[in-house]
């Protein structure tokens, strides 16, 4: 396995010059950055992608997990600039570039059934057809999107209804629709980069945040919160992209190589993440037995579901006809893949 290179943030610009030297289409070493640790879901996908590329070609993939090359905004910029060939980034961050990608933050749009989700992401016309040109406009070739697991709220006080979030400063990604979601839920949404979240919870700058279960364990967020709440409101989604100039410059054979690797990594990762939620929650409870875990009943979820209509309207207001068309197609795709 190629070793990742760690840069100080002050050296990123200088490092970029060295990295950029290898970005031509003929490069044997391709660079791939993602937002999580090597052992997290994005890391599992990246390692399988690397394995497939290297097993079926002479190319090499160099992996850069979270923090190696900066925050999420940094790795996206480096991919658009051609310094990186591949990037895995959640629509939560790309929403500022591609407003329609915020559709994944419309509450209760995505089902909690993991098998249904896996079929949807693989077969969806909205994802596989309609999103591609939107990403291309930003210099990105969308390879695929995949689910990382049901999102859980972690807080310092119990949450069983929307009123429990009143005056709670709740960390959200820098995503306009996610801000609107937590406003509608009754919280005070507080955008923060991930690197500041643990400390923010520790010092009470914020009192809550959301993420899939595996991430709560791997980042030890359970150490600085006391309650985990599953409201069924969302499933964390991420997207794998290539620099479009790089991808377009590949031979047809190498483009197929990349597509095949992305598909193999998708299938592998979906199975992994379906198991990760249960195993990682068990690890959290072993590490902190006093952690309180609540799965909201349908009655308890009712206020959150009522707020979802307001957020959906905000999404259409933000994105216009393009967003409305994608939302309509996603609903059709979800219905088509339900069984």
Swiss-Prot record:
UniProt-listed GO biological process terms: transmembrane transport
Ubl conjugation is among the record's keywords: no
Compartments it resides in: Periplasm
GO CC annotation, single: periplasmic space
Signal peptide, first to last residue: 1-20
Disulphide bridges: 162-303
Stored Pfam families: DctP
CDD domains linked to this entry: PBP2_TRAP_UehA_TeaA (cd13668)
Sorted UniProt keywords: Disulfide bond, Periplasm, Signal, Transport
Binding site for L-ectoine: 36, 171, 211, 215, 236
Major site of localization recorded for this protein: periplasm
UniProt-listed InterPro entries: DctP_fam, TRAP_DctP_sf
Family: Belongs to the bacterial solute-binding protein 7 family.
Note, other: Transport is enhanced in cells that are grown in the presence of ectoine, but not by high-salinity media.
Oligomer and partners: Monomer. The complex comprises the extracytoplasmic solute receptor protein UehA, and the two transmembrane proteins UehB and UehC.
Function, as annotated: Part of the tripartite ATP-independent periplasmic (TRAP) transport system UehABC, which imports both ectoine and 5-hydroxyectoine as nutrients, and not as osmoprotectants. UehA binds both ectoine and 5-hydroxyectoine with high specificity and affinity.
Listed name of the protein: Ectoine/5-hydroxyectoine-binding periplasmic protein UehA
Source organism: Ruegeria pomeroyi (strain ATCC 700808 / DSM 15171 / DSS-3) (Silicibacter pomeroyi)
Gene: uehA
